[in-house]
Amino acid sequence: FLSDATRQKITALRRKHRLHWPRAGTIDFGGFDRLTPVSQVFGYDRGLPIDRYYIEAFLQANTRDITGRCLELGDPGYITRFGQGVTRADVLHYVPGNPLATIVGDLTDAPHIPDNSFDCIIFTQTLQMIVDPRAALRTIHRILKPDGVALITSAGIAKIGRKLGRDDWGEYWHFTSQSLHLISAEIWGEANTTIGSYGNVMSACSFLQG
C-alpha cells in the first residue's frame, strides 16, 4: 500500500536507528552456524528428507488419480504405496540395467513409447535433471491418455544433487512455482494445469542442511 519512495524512506530510517526486528546481530543460528550441511545426502542418513514429506503429502492428496495404467521413474514405489485400482505399473529408466524397468528411454526423445498409453504418470524430483524440460513435458503429455494425469514435483530451494563428471547426469534447474506453471501451461493449457508449492523458511533452511 506504500509508494516506493515511502518504503525507501522507512528502510533508510530503520537502518539508521537499528529498528530491525529481530535486531540486527541478535539472531542465534545455533547448529546452522556452519559452512557445510549437517548431512551430505539430504538427510537420508538421519531419517526422511524434508522434501519427501511434502512429496508424499502431495501424492496422498491425489491418490484418486493414481489408477489404471501408471508410469513411474526408477521404481514403482509410489504407485504401489498410493495407487488405487492400478491395472498395470510400468517403470521408466534412462539407461539400461535397472531390473525394475519395463521401458528404457530418454523422455526428451522417446518415439518408441506409444501415444495415449498411461492414465497416470508419477514424475517426482526429476525435471530439474533434464536439460530440456519442455521436451520432457511434451513427451509426458503425448503418452498420457486424453483424460490422464501427470503428478509432477520438482525442487525449489535445495542443494545441487547431481553433478556432471561425478554422476551419470547433472542437475540443471531449480524451478519456482511461476516458472513451472509457465512451461506446464504452454503444453497442457491453463485450464488443465494446477501448481502448488510447499514449505516455509524453516523447512527450506533445514532441507539445505539435510
Regions found by a protein language model. Name each.
Residues 14-64:
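Class I SAM-dependent methyltransferase Rossmann-like catalytic core
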Residues 46, 163-183:
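Acceptor-substrate binding/catalytic loop of class I
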Residues 52-111:
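Class I SAM-dependent methyltransferase SAM/SAH-binding core
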Residues 108-121:
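A short acidic, Gly/Pro-enriched loop at the edge of an enzyme's catalytic core
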Residues 119-132:
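A short SAM/SAH-binding and catalytic strip from SAM-dependent methyltransferases
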Residues 134-149:
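A short glycine-rich, Lys/Arg-flanked "PGG" loop and its adjoining helix->strand segment in the class I
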Residues 152-154, 158:
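Acidic carboxylate diad motif detector
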Residues 191-210:
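Conserved catalytic loop of SAM-dependent methyltransferase domains
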